[in-house]
């Protein structure tokens, strides 16, 4: 007899109802809950899956390289990066009629999809110039992908499975990850930038055929070994340097110029190389700090145990944290996701403000798409961090081990933490909404001069301190007599000051009352999301209603007062509610970024400054005005090359709206629905020939909410993606 799905749970496999399938899918990745799972086996399975994850990433990147080389126009784009629109891939679609074939055809090619991912600018900056190089890169990544898949398989074989003690050897792991993963990889990337990318930016091709015979600097390695390192920073590219050619090119490879290359409006490659080298140096040193084989260096347990507050009135400090974190994968994952979430959000900010890739800042749609993309990813990562923090408290937290330490004390005064967050959220919410509504009311009644408009003085002061001259604050870097200004004048400051005060760059945009209001609206969203997540995690193990619910698990729903009021203590429900707040908060962030930039790019920043002070301005002058290209993508009179985005805009709305059917429901409703469907199925000719072995039962409350949430999130993001791309490329094609 064939084993029923899921093999990892005997109890589920024997369930006679359809919940066997849904619970099987839901718990497929909950490895620690599988039958016969030991701690060692759990670590080994997760370790092996990392190789699979990396293989998928490299396979995906290989696909990008391959399709651009095969169907793109990379070489034409390299010749004229500001005139040619980059092609992602061809479109072969039987639905295309004559007008669509024309609309989606560029330069006598077959219909194509335009690339808004920034890969052209990235590959160009790091030294790619021909399709053949793209093909080679693709094949290389494909081979690497295969090697990683093999490595994943190999590490599941009995002889090659690492032991549990190997996984829990924190010092060795830290040393290897810091030195190897971060340090050596940064050093390798510095090498690539210096040996391949920089010469390419100066018109010198370096490939597999000549990389050993083409030194990146005319002085070779002599200055390195003689300690005369300043030679590498002499003779810079001139301001008139034509990127990708030797015209105006210098020879320096490691610099501290500050600002941007005048032609490409991207960071100087030699500055990036210098930065990457510094990171490599710091991390390689850091990777030699922890005590392993030689009995020297730091010991993590000693460091944590030594962190006890003086005076003894603040408890046991970090005692117990070493064992707690070492033995809990959930808290490790939570910390990693939180760090990665912050890094991803910072990437979104720096990708446009300090553009690293040549000509990226001239491709407005790509810039907008990359910002939106990275902010949404950051949101999901951050919510995931808190979700795993809550699971840690349910599954892994040991009150005895953590007695009176920082974790225990945080739990003991959680009411204070939650109430303070609540007060901050209430203050922000009432004041921000009150200001917006006041402004809407006076504008509606014909007295716009009575709006309450705050000048963001503190933010302007910070911008001025960083060198922004427009506010006339004369402080720190915007003061010519300040010691900081004098100190930096010989090195990076002239380039930086030129960049920060140049109206063509995105570095510290001029701000006003509209920015002040939306900043506080975003702060409201962040604080409420944090409140929900923090409360969900701190109450995950128990609350006033249920002092300890360790055996209750993590993913039970808030189900109203009928079952004893589980809304107070459901960590899963907190995660679920926080997802909506996270999505809406990032909506405010991306709306703000996109609208402000649309007005700057269009040469009319005054539109944002005037209309962003009241809600109707946002609805009318941002959403409605910019959705016109989408609404007119196709109509009774024909279509244009935005029609696919227009259709996706509609499709996204439909997915989003479908979510509400699952969100506004309860378990009895689902049971009735499924039984009605079964009844109809069994009485319909032909359909009743098909039977299923499992008895159909309703979705659980958690499952229905998850289905609703997925529709809400996917529909929401698809809708906004289509809006950003079509509205920006429609205006700035």
Curated annotation (Swiss-Prot):
Residues that hold phylloquinone according to the record: 670
Binding annotation for chlorophyll a B1: 653
SUPFAM superfamilies per the UniProt record, alphabetical: Photosystem I subunits PsaA/PsaB
Cofactor note: P700 is a chlorophyll a/chlorophyll a' dimer, A0 is one or more chlorophyll a, A1 is one or both phylloquinones and FX is a shared 4Fe-4S iron-sulfur center.
Bilayer-spanning residue ranges: 46-69, 134-157, 174-198, 272-290, 329-352, 368-394, 416-438, 516-534, 574-595, 642-664, 706-726
Annotated PROSITE patterns: PHOTOSYSTEM_I_PSAAB
Pfam families: PsaA_PsaB
Subcellular location field: Plastid, Chloroplast thylakoid membrane
UniProt topology in membrane: Multi-pass membrane protein
Protein's GO biological process: photosynthesis
Assembly and binders: The PsaA/B heterodimer binds the P700 chlorophyll special pair and subsequent electron acceptors. PSI consists of a core antenna complex that captures photons, and an electron transfer chain that converts photonic excitation into a charge separation. The eukaryotic PSI reaction center is composed of at least 11 subunits.
Function noted in UniProt: PsaA and PsaB bind P700, the primary electron donor of photosystem I (PSI), as well as the electron acceptors A0, A1 and FX. PSI is a plastocyanin/cytochrome c6-ferredoxin oxidoreductase, converting photonic excitation into a charge separation, which transfers an electron from the donor P700 chlorophyll pair to the spectroscopically characterized acceptors A0, A1, FX, FA and FB in turn. Oxidized P700 is reduced on the lumenal side of the thylakoid membrane by plastocyanin or cytochrome c6.
Protein name, entry field: Photosystem I P700 chlorophyll a apoprotein A2
């Amino acid at each position: 007899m064939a084993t029923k799905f899921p093999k990892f749970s005997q109890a589920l496999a024997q369930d006679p109802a359809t919940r066997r399938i849904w619970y099987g899918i839901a718990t497929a990745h909950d490895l620690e809950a599988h039958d016969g799972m030991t701690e060692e086996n759990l670590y080994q399975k997760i370790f092996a899956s990392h190789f699979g994850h990396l293989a998928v990433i490299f396979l995906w990147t290989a696909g990008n390289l391959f399709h651009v080389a095969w169907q793109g126009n990379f070489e034409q784009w390299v010749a004229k990066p500001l005139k040619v629109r980059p092609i992602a891939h061809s479109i072969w679609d039987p639905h295309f009629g004559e007008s669509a074939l024309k609309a989606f055809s560029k330069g006598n090619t077959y219909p194509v999809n335009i690339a808004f991912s920034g890969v052209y600018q990235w590959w160009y900056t790091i030294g790619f110039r021909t399709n053949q190089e793209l093909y080679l890169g693709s094949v290389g990544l494909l081979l690497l992908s295969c090697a990683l898949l093999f490595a994943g398989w190999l590490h599941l074989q009995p002889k090659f499975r690492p032991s549990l003690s190997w996984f829990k050897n924190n010092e060795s792991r830290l040393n290897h990850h810091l030195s190897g993963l971060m340090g050596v990889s940064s050093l390798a990337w510095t090498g690539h930038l210096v040996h391949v990318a920089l010469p390419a930016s100066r018109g010198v091709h370096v490939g597999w055929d000549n990389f050993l015979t083409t030194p990146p600097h005319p002085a070779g390695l002599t200055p390195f070994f003689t300690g005369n390192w300043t030679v590498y920073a002499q003779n810079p590219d001139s301001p008139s340097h034509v990127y990708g050619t030797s015209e105006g090119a210098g020879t320096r490879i490691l610099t501290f110029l500050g600002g941007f290359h005048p032609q490409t409006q991207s960071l100087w490659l030699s500055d990036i190389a210098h930065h990457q080298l510094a990171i490599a140096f710091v991390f390689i040193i850091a990777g030699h700090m922890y005590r392993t084989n030689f009995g020297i260096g730091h010991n993590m347990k000693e460091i944590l145990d030594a962190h006890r507050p003086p005076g003894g009135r603040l408890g046991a400090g970090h005692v117990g944290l070493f064992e707690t974190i070492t033995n809990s994968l959930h808290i490790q994952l939570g910390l990693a996701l939180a760090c990665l979430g912050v890094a991803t959000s910072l990437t979104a900010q720096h990708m446009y403000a300090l553009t690293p890739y040549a000509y990226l800042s001239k491709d407005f749609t790509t810039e907008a798409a990359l910002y939106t993309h990275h902010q949404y990813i950051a949101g999901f990562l951050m919510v995931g961090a808190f979700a795993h923090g809550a699971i840690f408290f349910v599954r892994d937290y040991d009150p005895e081990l953590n007695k009176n330490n920082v974790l225990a004390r945080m739990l003991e005064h959680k009411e204070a933490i939650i109430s303070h967050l609540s007060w901050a959220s209430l203050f922000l919410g009432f004041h921000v909404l009150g200001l917006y509504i006041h402004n809407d009311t006076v504008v509606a009644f014909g007295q716009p001069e009575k709006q309450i408009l705050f000048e963001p003085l503190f933010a302007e002061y910070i911008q001025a301190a960083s060198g922004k001259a427009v506010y006339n604050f004369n402080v720190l870097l915007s003061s010519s007599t300040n010691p900081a200004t004098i100190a930096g004048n010989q090195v990076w400051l002239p380039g930086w000051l030129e960049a920060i005060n140049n109206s063509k760059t995105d570095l510290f945009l001029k701000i006003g009352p509209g920015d002040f209001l939306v900043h506080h609206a975003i702060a409201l969203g962040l604080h409420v999301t944090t409140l929900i997540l923090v409360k969900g995690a701190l109450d995950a193990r128990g609350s006033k209603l249920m002092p300890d619910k360790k055996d209750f698990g993590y993913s039970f729903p808030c189900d109203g007062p009928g079952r004893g009021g589980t809304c107070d203590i459901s960590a899963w429900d907190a995660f679920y509610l926080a997802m909506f707040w996270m999505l809406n908060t990032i909506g405010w962030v991306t709306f703000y970024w996109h609208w402000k930039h649309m007005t700057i790019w269009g040469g009319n920043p005054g539109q944002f400054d005037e209309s962003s002070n009241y809600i109707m301005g946002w609805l009318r002058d941002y959403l409605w005005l910019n959705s016109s290209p989408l609404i007119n993508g196709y109509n009774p009179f024909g279509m244009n090359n935005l029609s696919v985005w227009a259709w996706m805009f509609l499709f996204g709305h439909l997915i989003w709206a479908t979510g509400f059917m699952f969100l506004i429901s309860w378990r009895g409703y689902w049971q009735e629905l499924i039984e009605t469907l079964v009844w109809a199925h069994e009485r319909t000719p032909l359909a009743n020939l098909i039977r299923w072995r499992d008895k159909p039962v309703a979705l659980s409350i958690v499952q229905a909410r998850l289905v609703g949430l997925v529709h809400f999130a996917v529909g929401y993001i698809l809708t906004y993606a289509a809006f950003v791309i079509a509205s920006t490329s429609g205006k700035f094609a």
